[in-house]
Amino acid sequence: MMRRLIATISLSAVALVGIVASEGYTDRAVIPVPGDVPTIGFGTTEGVKMGETTTPPKALARALQDVGRYEGAVRQCVKVPLHQHEYDAYVSLAYNIGSRAFCGSTLVRKLNAEDYPGACLEILRWD
């Protein structure tokens, strides 16, 4: 199958399930590691305040909003066609490291130079 322009791709349902499953769920704001920012639900950080609580349906709705923002970042930064699985992986990475880190990464530079294998290997640097 050929790569497609990313404007024609959206995050797959499988990738969304993978993101929320790997993030895990917390019903109250926590600081997952020392020095990190407050996180709630399925990894949401934007606008989260300590003491905040949520429910699974609200957390999933918030995760969908977050995914939309990270998809926007991937679409803005990546200028080359992708396979669905590549797009899913890069949106998932952006969800984990943030839009700024993703867009400023060596991974994106390699990807935009059509160094697909090199970009893929860069994911491992964020593990």
Segments the model singles out, each with a brief description of its role:
Residues 1-127:
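Cell-wall polysaccharide-cleaving catalytic domain and substrate-binding groove, primarily
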